[in-house]
Structures are given as C-alpha cells and as structure tokens.
C-alpha cells in the first residue's frame, strides 16, 4: 500500500513539518490520471518510509485535493480520508474485503464514523474511548450512532446507499477516474459523488454494488461550538440541495431502480422538506395548545 498526503496550498508549516518529520526529498512521480486540480508544485518521497508521498499543490479545497491524490495513486483501490480522522487498526483490511469477495462488482465501501471528542488519542492512535464533557458532541454521538448503525445498514441492505462519508471511504480507482473524480462546484462533494456513481453505473448498464460495513470504524472530531455546528449543517443542507438540483432527472425515475424510486425521493422528503416542516411544527404546536386545539 501507499500513503499519499496532499498539502492543499497550506500557508502554515505543514509541508516543512512533513519534510522534516519524515525525511522527505523532492522526487518525480508520474500522474496516472489527469483529473481536474489546481497546479501541482511538486512531489516528495520519504527516505525512511518509501511508501509515503506528499503532493504539494495550490489551494483548491477538499474535492480538488482528493482528485490530486487519486490522480497520483497507482493501486486499484484508493482510500480517501480527512487529515483529522483516525482509522482503527483493522479498518483498511475490513474495507478491502468486500472488493475481494464481490467479483469486481464492488465500486465503493464506507464505514461507521464515530465522535473522537473526549477520547484519549496518542501518537495518531485512539487509546481510550471517552465521552466529551461538552454536551454538544454528546448529542452528536447519539445522532451518529443512529445514522451509521441503523439508517446506513438498512440502505446498504436494500442497495439504496446514497452517501459514503467524506471523512472515510474506499473506492475502486478505475471507476473514480471514469467519472472524472470529485466535482468542484458543490460543497457536498461526498453525497454528489455517490449519487453520480449510481447514475454512472446504471447509465452504463453494469452490475455494481456500493456497500457499508459497520465494523469499519473511523474516528473524527465533531463541532464543539454552536457556530461550527451551524456552519457544518448549513453546508450539508446546501450540498444536498445542489446534488438534487444537479441530478433531478433521477428523482422518481424508474430507469434508476430503487435509487430513483425510493432513495432520491427520501432525500427530498427528509433533507429538503423535513427541516422547514419541523420548524413549522415548533411554531404551530404551541399556538395550537394556546388556542385549545390540542
């Protein structure tokens, strides 16, 4: 395996720290797939860890950085992971297993995302699981458990999985390259990628599978302040809207099977109509109680 770290135009000492910490030298590396990215300034190889590379490039945000890594990757499978996420020790092996057992049909695998706030982390490894003392991450622990241990499992079982978290996902590289990688014109690149992957494979009329394995656990930091949580949820909502607008022809379309008839309408109801309906409920119920209607 290889580890490719993408320095996405950072203006701090990230690149210098990587070069010094891992004894890296500038080395030429051929880009296998020319996906859309900002300018590549250089590639570096570790002299102490020959399978560790760093790509230095101009700032282009998450999707652009992921495309750079995919373009330089040489392995048939690629794992896209956020810099602040930690995979449990057997995570990659568990993620690779479905690809080996599915006769080439598997194109993407996701895992459970857990909240790392409050946990003991040393040397890049999670040593002890603890709850955060802050109530905001605690509420998100319950939310994430519901999402990843019930909803995603059910979606995967019915072949209607529309989202593999941007924090951690394993993909067949050839499929990503065929699709042109991640798109730059959406803030919900993880959702858009999987929806487009369904569309791409069904338009090609090829048998495929996108799976979720709950035993794969990736730990990540959740927003601990209301401002950060608000920005995160606004970004998720915007990403869902952008994806639905881009792929609106899939909604209710029998050509896309369960994805078009069930999964896409579910996103419309839950993510688009749900929030305003819930807000309306908060306003209507107290008024109805005051008027004696409830």
Predicted regions and their residues:
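Short beta-strand/loop segment that forms part of the nucleotide-sugar
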Residues: 1-9, 35, 55
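A conserved acidic beta->alpha catalytic loop
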Residues: 7-27
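Acidic metal-phosphate-binding loop of nucleotide-sugar-dependent transferases
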Residues: 11, 85-86, 113
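Long helical/loop segments within the catalytic core of UDP-sugar-dependent glycosyltransferases
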Residues: 27-67, 89-186, 201, 234-237, ...
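Short aromatic/hydrophobic "clamp" motif used to bind/position activated sugar donors
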Residues: 78
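Basic/Trp-rich segment in TM-proximal cytosolic loops or flexible interdomain/linker regions
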Residues: 153-160, 223-294
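A short, conserved alpha-helix in the catalytic core of glycosyltransferases
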Residues: 175-178, 186-212
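Active-site donor/metal-binding and catalytic loop motifs
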Residues: 208-227
